[in-house]
């Protein structure tokens, strides 16, 4: 399978963003014709760092689950549904050959939408322990790439 279009999702922290940018840079070294689109969370650092690295990014209204201020989770289901709907729209418009999730809550809606649309997805886990999003989506991933054995 020839990969020409790749969508990369995730973010929230530099621990997710910089590995995502590194993946895109490494793939471009192999084949400079590959087209990339990043998807992150609105208002988070990826919305600034990814364009500075030379890639296009679209933000989703997704937020993480609050573990200390539980009342802030009241709008989470609505933001998740809107992010899922937008993810389906983004995937249908961009038509990627594969999706790559690098963790963080921003990757959840996009990888779920990719699964729904039959787009193969890969997970990259750079931490010694997988986060909630990567654990939840691991079962249907084509491959999982880890930094630690």
Place the predicted regions along the sequence by residue.
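Glycine/small-residue-rich loop that forms an oxyanion/phosphate-binding "nest" at active or ligand-binding sites
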Residues: 87, 91, 105, 126
């Amino acid at each position: 399978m020839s990969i020409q279009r790749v969508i990369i999702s995730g973010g929230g922290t530099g621990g997710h963003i910089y590995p995502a940018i590194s993946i895109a840079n490494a793939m471009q070294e192999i084949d400079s014709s590959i087209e990339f689109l990043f998807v992150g969370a609105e208002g988070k650092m990826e919305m600034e760092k990814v364009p500075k690295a030379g890639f296009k990014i679209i933000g989703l209204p997704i937020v993480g689950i609050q573990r200390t201020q539980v009342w802030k989770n009241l709008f989470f289901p609505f933001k998740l549904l809107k992010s899922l709907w937008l993810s389906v729209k983004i995937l249908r418009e961009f038509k990627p050959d594969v999706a790559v999730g690098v963790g963080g809550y921003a990757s959840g809606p996009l990888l779920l939408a990719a699964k729904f649309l039959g787009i193969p997805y890969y997970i990259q886990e750079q931490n010694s322990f997988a986060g909630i999003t990567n654990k939840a989506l691991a079962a249907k991933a084509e491959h999982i790439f880890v930094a630690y054995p």
